[in-house]
Amino acid sequence: TQLNDLSSYYNNMGLNTDGEFTEEVKTAKEQMDKEGLKESESMADEIESALKAANVDNQVEITATNKYVMLNMNGGILFNSGEADLTPEAVSLLDSVAGAIYQYNDNYITIEGHTDSNPINTAKFPDNMMLSVHRAHSVYNYLVNNKGFDAKTMTSSGRGENVPIADNTTAEGRAQNRRVEIKIYNNLNSDIQ
């Protein structure tokens, strides 16, 4: 009876007897991924149009995945070196970004801060992780406190130098790695977080 119980358990979980997903589950996941990508691409088009209208599309890189739309903003525009306070240019850019994404305020939104690999050790920021946490939180605070975004559907976190998108051995690569990413999850994935 234990084998029957195990077989029943696997079937209820959408798994075959080898513990692998059944073809039905795989097909459903592929379909959900396609629908998610289609929705994210539509969101990305709307956001990009709004950023173009605000004449800031050259300051934000937009990527659509099957789960979310990611806005990548260069940290050099947002912050002075070694600081987490928003620059006046950052406030202007975030005003435009907020206008472009506010329609998705009910969706789950994450804000991630990233740094290059150059070590920092100040009284305020003992390492890059703390700097990235504070930078992400500065963007979060601005959007929640100044632009009316819902704190219940938005989070901020820092990743330090742990998720580079370019080579940290060059000045250009380090500049690309200093960034803040805003991820707006599509409707299919907003409730899953």
Which sequence ranges carry the predicted segments?
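Juxtamembrane linker/hinge segments adjacent to a transmembrane helix in small membrane proteins
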Residues: 1-75
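Periplasmic OmpA-like peptidoglycan-binding domain that tethers envelope proteins to the cell wall
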Residues: 72, 78-96, 100-104, 114-193
